[in-house]
From Swiss-Prot:
The keyword rRNA-binding applies. Part of the 50S ribosomal subunit. It comes from Methylorubrum populi (strain ATCC BAA-705 / NCIMB 13946 / BJ001) (Methylobacterium populi). The keyword Transport does not apply. It comes from the Bacteria. NCBIfam families: rplV_bact. This protein binds specifically to 23S rRNA; its binding is stimulated by other ribosomal proteins, e.g. L4, L17, and L20. It is important during the early stages of 50S assembly. It makes multiple contacts with different domains of the 23S rRNA in the assembled 50S subunit and ribosome. HAMAP family: Ribosomal_uL22_B. One of its GO terms (biological process) is translation. It holds the Pfam family Ribosomal_L22. Belongs to the universal ribosomal protein uL22 family. This is Large ribosomal subunit protein uL22. Keywords: Ribonucleoprotein, Ribosomal protein, RNA-binding, rRNA-binding.
Length: 127
């Protein structure tokens, strides 16, 4: 028997990809995510290709995964895809110890982030 299939959380014209545990602070990752929000996917890929930020490589990989999900799993047209959402969340924070003078210590925080990219198929109206 088994449980019935859960309904799809996204509309039929959307696909998403999630990159978890990226070793960067959410604030820095959000700078790159804001760069691609609302753009066509080919423009967003070009922007990420030439971005000087280190995390842009991981964001590009996640965007390519979202495009592949849209094409292979949901039969969407790649040429009509737009980045509808790109949002960042906090993951765990590694805490490390840094020895300082006079027997003291300082805490080093190494944050991790999660990135979710949602692409939407926007049909061009025939003029």
């Amino acid at each position: 028997m088994g449980k019935p299939a859960t309904p799809r959380a996204l509309p039929e014209n959307e696909a998403k990809a999630v990159a978890r545990m990226l070793r960067v602070s959410p604030q820095k990752l959000n700078l790159v995510a804001a760069l691609i929000r609302g753009k066509k996917v080919d423009t967003a890929l070009a922007d990420l290709e030439f971005s000087r930020k280190r995390i842009a490589r991981d964001v590009k990989k996640c965007l390519e995964s979202a495009i592949a999900n849209a094409e292979n799993n949901h039969d969407l047209d790649v040429d009509d895809l737009v980045v509808s959402q790109a949002f960042v969340g906090k993951a765990l924070v590694l805490k490390r110890f840094h020895a300082r003078a006079r027997g003291r210590g300082a805490r080093i925080l190494k944050p991790f982030s999660n990135l979710t990219i949602v692409v939407r198929e926007v049909r061009a109206e025939a003029a």
